[in-house]
Curated annotation (Swiss-Prot):
Residues 63-100 are annotated as: Disordered. Keywords: Amidation, Neuropeptide, Pyrrolidone carboxylic acid, Secreted, Signal. Stimulates feeding and grooming behavior, metabolic rate and locomotor activity and increases blood pressure. May have orexigenic activity. May promote aldosterone secretion by the adrenal gland. This is Orexigenic neuropeptide QRFP. One of its GO terms (molecular function) is orexigenic neuropeptide QRFP receptor binding. The modification Pyrrolidone carboxylic acid is found at Q80. Residues 18-79 form a propeptide. GO terms for cellular component: extracellular region. Coiled coil: none annotated. The gene is Qrfp. It comes from the Eukaryota. It is found in: Secreted. GO terms for biological process: grooming behavior; locomotory behavior; neuropeptide signaling pathway; positive regulation of blood pressure; regulation of feeding behavior.
Amino acid sequence: MRCLCSWLCLLLPLSACFPLLDRRGPTDIGDIGARMSWVQLTEGHTPRSVQSPRPQALLVVAKEQQASRREHTGFRLGRQDSGSEATGFLPTDSEKASGPLGTLAEELSSYSRRKGGFSFRFGR
């Protein structure tokens, strides 16, 4: 009885490695079950895999993902060579601080002109 149990313990992981070819139909990927037999699998013959993606297709997918990320980030812009990055965000003499940029700054980053600048709120 002990010998039977040890054989079952050895064969159980082995059965997990090999798919049940006779029970699977033509729904297998690449129809491996119809083309390969147990003898060929045990001899080390590997079934031909489905055609791997081409490198050009992978580049196209990567570029599409980058483009979709740019759409989701809103108005994040790349670097601009002319001037400092912060000059576009500071109000000029002719522009009031209560313009659309000022109200947006108040709403998003708790900027308050009454308090005299930025205030950091912890816990929110």
